[in-house]
Amino acid sequence: MKCAHFVQQQCLSCRHINQPMPVQVAAKSQVLSQLLSGFEVEQWREPVFGPESGFRNKAKMVVLGAAHQPILGIVTPTGEPVSLCDCNLYPIDMQQLLHRLELFVRQAGIPPYNVDKVKGELKFILLTRSQIKGEYLLRFVLRSHKSIERIERELPQLLSEYPQIKVVSVNIQPVHMAILEGEEELFLTEETRLSEQFNDVPLFIRPKSFFQTHPEIAAKLYQTAREWVAELKPDTLWDLFCGVGGFGLHCASKQSALTGIEISAEAITCAKLSAEAMGLTQVNFTALDSTGFAQGCDAKDKPDVVIVNPPRRGIGESLCQSLSAFAPKAILYSSCNPHTLAKDLACIQGYRVQKVQLFDMFPHTDHFEVLVMLLKDA
């Protein structure tokens, strides 16, 4: 993939952009193989990867420049602001909308937040795209409430031009710190969630809920998880760090009981909506800390299968110990950090590594997703 920003050393996020996708994936596979070399892996599945461009469904744009000439993008290594509205990771329609949002900020006259001077209002514009319908969730991250009226003044024209923008919100982030969002979220549209669908599972996205950024690979990841779990025919499932429920909802059946645990209340709201839409009645999604939940359960609550999809820090020693004690017949671990994955696998006692498969969720970078099936020792 060609990128002028990379050639000019303005943006270095896609550090492996000059390598063909198969070469990138081979290098990632080698890293994973080395990290898991201490484990006896019964089956290495072929890695899964997708297109090199137009795949990303979320843009996190720093708002730079001035009110009369705003720039949505990043600060270069040399300190210059550069627009990334034409980033090839985004679909063409998303690039076009990002350019229109630069114009929107100028028309609204909202001063970008200046970190050095601690002045200005608009910090970030966050844009999420639903691949099923090409609809959008748009968020403005502001320092205060001062500029909300300016956004509301220009919003009707924007929505008339882009009716596919279904959800618009303002997030208030008042502190002078490198924090993406604050606690307060104000909706400027009647709709408060974006509809999405992976495979046959309806999913919903709210402003603060985590969602995978590569829909094509995420759908394949969820489908693979479904197939692996189906082989076990579980009656009870736990989905820890469940987010909006993608893994659990793919793996549950109308006969099985699913418990989903996630710290984000917004994500749990979305998961409940999905379960209702699917007609699943033996489902319990709850906003709790996953480690605390597991530690508070009794042995009689032991599930047949536990699914974990933690953040980059992994599940940690305490949860590893809890899972080892519960001894479900299988643990399905989806990881975005192979280093913490290897550490956790070494901590979980009494299991063998049945299957491992790499999913290249983050092309042109060193990052990737890994799906691992652990089976209880006989």
UniProtKB/Swiss-Prot annotation:
CDD domains the record matches: AdoMet_MTases
Record's keyword terms, sorted: 4Fe-4S, Iron, Iron-sulfur, Metal-binding, Methyltransferase, rRNA processing, S-adenosyl-L-methionine, Transferase
Reaction(s) the record says it catalyses: uridine(747) in 23S rRNA + S-adenosyl-L-methionine = 5-methyluridine(747) in 23S rRNA + S-adenosyl-L-homocysteine + H(+)
Family matches, as Pfam families: tRNA_U5-meth_tr (PF05958)
Active-site residues annotated for this sequence: 336 (nucleophile)
InterPro entries xrefs: 23SrRNA_MeTrfase_RlmC (IPR011825), MeTrfase_TrmA_AS (IPR030390), MeTrfase_TrmA_CS (IPR030391), SAM-dependent_MTases_sf (IPR029063), U5_MeTrfase_fam (IPR010280)
Binding residues for S-adenosyl-L-methionine: 212, 241, 262, 309
Similarity comment: family membership: Belongs to the class I-like SAM-binding methyltransferase superfamily. RNA M5U methyltransferase family. RlmC subfamily.
Job of this protein: Catalyzes the formation of 5-methyl-uridine at position 747 (m5U747) in 23S rRNA.
Name of the protein in question: 23S rRNA (uracil(747)-C(5))-methyltransferase RlmC
Annotated gene: rlmC
